[in-house]
Amino acid sequence: MARKALIVKQQKPQKYKTREYNRCKICGRPRAYLRKFGMCRLCFRKYAHQGMIPGVKKASW
């Protein structure tokens, strides 16, 4: 889990646009962020397995 201080710090408007970065909306993780879903890969995998993300299913070929 991300530290609360870092999450709050990131939410404040930055002086320069390049300092902004994406965080997972669920756990606050800054790495492995999936833009299309707005969450990190770990939360994506968890919710996809539970069937909570519409249109996502496990690949099989």
Curated annotation (Swiss-Prot):
Gene3D superfamilies, A to Z: 30s Ribosomal Protein S14, Chain N
Names of required cofactors: Zn(2+)
GO biological process entries: translation
Keywords from the UniProt entry: Metal-binding, Ribonucleoprotein, Ribosomal protein, RNA-binding, rRNA-binding, Zinc
Positions that bind Zn(2+): C24, C27, C40, C43
Gene Ontology molecular-function annotations: rRNA binding; structural constituent of ribosome; zinc ion binding
Signal peptide start-end: none
Ribosomal protein keyword on record: yes
Family: Belongs to the universal ribosomal protein uS14 family. Zinc-binding uS14 subfamily.
Described purpose of this protein according to its UniProt entry: Binds 16S rRNA, required for the assembly of 30S particles and may also be responsible for determining the conformation of the 16S rRNA at the A site.
Name assigned to this protein: Small ribosomal subunit protein uS14
Gene name for this UniProt entry: rpsZ
